[in-house]
């Protein structure tokens, strides 16, 4: 059984930055450090940080006065940000800069009095945070997930519309929704640069190449990870059996016993240690040494907040 690895896979710059912010805060200030929502959607990462003293909460009211609070990589609404400001808290923002870019687009539309349409998944924390950047009572903010949704919404002024997208969507699905938006609202204005982030796009491109060669595709990522789910769905759309797994323990021998080639990739919030454990498990089931496919090189780095960088050097 051949083992193929997608390239690129695993951590993106935004996830690296978010985890570093929590780790640095723990190293500098000591436990406990409060984090609003899971800092990234990966069970292994969250459990590891929890063991070191991170406390994950959903409501600002759960954070005691004087504590340190970190916003997750998914971003928060202005209401949440304002609530935190009203408290005696030290706040660090781990929002991915590429999510912040979308926040700025929404805020700009709100200031201009444009109505805004967000393409995204209802209930996802990134969507909640992005929708929460719109505050113009004279306008409106709408959420759509599919081309069908586009034809159901009612706007006030079809000539003063803009759209944005969640950063972790399926590139193909989003393209269909954008086509529907442009068809229904010919004057709608989109972002100058795609909102779907480079890491999401690159990992979907990589899983396409992987699925062309593999009989079975294993996607390492947690069930609540949007970008990981999109990778599994893409492989399935290409006619391949695909499984979303948290770790190597999820792999069932029956999944791969008749496979000549098993492909492995990982969502943007899944650490490489989990991929290595999957390779070890597959080898135990008869797999050969893993071979990595060629793919796009990623050199993007997002710095942690200045305060944490300075404090981190002092600690060292």
Swiss-Prot record:
Cofactor(s) needed: [4Fe-4S] cluster
User: Which enzyme type, at the first EC level?
Assistant: oxidoreductase
Where on the tree of life does the source sit, at the highest rank? Bacteria
What are the positions of the active site? 126
Catalyzed reaction equations: isopentenyl diphosphate + 2 oxidized [2Fe-2S]-[ferredoxin] + H2O = (2E)-4-hydroxy-3-methylbut-2-enyl diphosphate + 2 reduced [2Fe-2S]-[ferredoxin] + 2 H(+); dimethylallyl diphosphate + 2 oxidized [2Fe-2S]-[ferredoxin] + H2O = (2E)-4-hydroxy-3-methylbut-2-enyl diphosphate + 2 reduced [2Fe-2S]-[ferredoxin] + 2 H(+)
Q: Name one GO biological process term.
A: dimethylallyl diphosphate biosynthetic process
Pfam families listed in its UniProt record: LYTB
Question: Where along this sequence does the record place binding of (2E)-4-hydroxy-3-methylbut-2-enyl diphosphate?
Answer: 41, 74, 124, 167, 225-227, 269
Q: Which InterPro entries match?
A: LytB/IspH
Pathway in which the depicted protein is active: Isoprenoid biosynthesis; dimethylallyl diphosphate biosynthesis; dimethylallyl diphosphate from (2E)-4-hydroxy-3-methylbutenyl diphosphate: step 1/1; Isoprenoid biosynthesis; isopentenyl diphosphate biosynthesis via DXP pathway; isopentenyl diphosphate from 1-deoxy-D-xylulose 5-phosphate: step 6/6
The signal sequence is none
The residues listed in the UniProt record as binding dimethylallyl diphosphate, with positions renumbered to this chain, are 41, 74, 124, 225-227, 269
Q: Which UniProt keywords apply?
A: 4Fe-4S, Iron, Iron-sulfur, Isoprene biosynthesis, Metal-binding, Oxidoreductase
How is the cofactor bound here? Binds 1 [4Fe-4S] cluster per subunit.
E.C. numbers: 1.17.7.4
UniProt binding sites for [4Fe-4S] cluster: 12, 96, 197
Residues binding isopentenyl diphosphate are: 41, 74, 124, 225-227, 269
Gene Ontology molecular function terms on file: 4 iron, 4 sulfur cluster binding; 4-hydroxy-3-methylbut-2-enyl diphosphate reductase activity; metal ion binding
On assembly, the entry states:
Homodimer.
Q: Which family does it belong to?
A: Belongs to the IspH family.
Protein task: Catalyzes the conversion of 1-hydroxy-2-methyl-2-(E)-butenyl 4-diphosphate (HMBPP) into a mixture of isopentenyl diphosphate (IPP) and dimethylallyl diphosphate (DMAPP). Acts in the terminal step of the DOXP/MEP pathway for isoprenoid precursor biosynthesis.
Instruction: Report the protein name in the record.
Output: 4-hydroxy-3-methylbut-2-enyl diphosphate reductase
Instruction: Say which species the protein is native to.
Output: Cronobacter sakazakii (strain ATCC BAA-894) (Enterobacter sakazakii)
Q: Which gene encodes it?
A: ispH
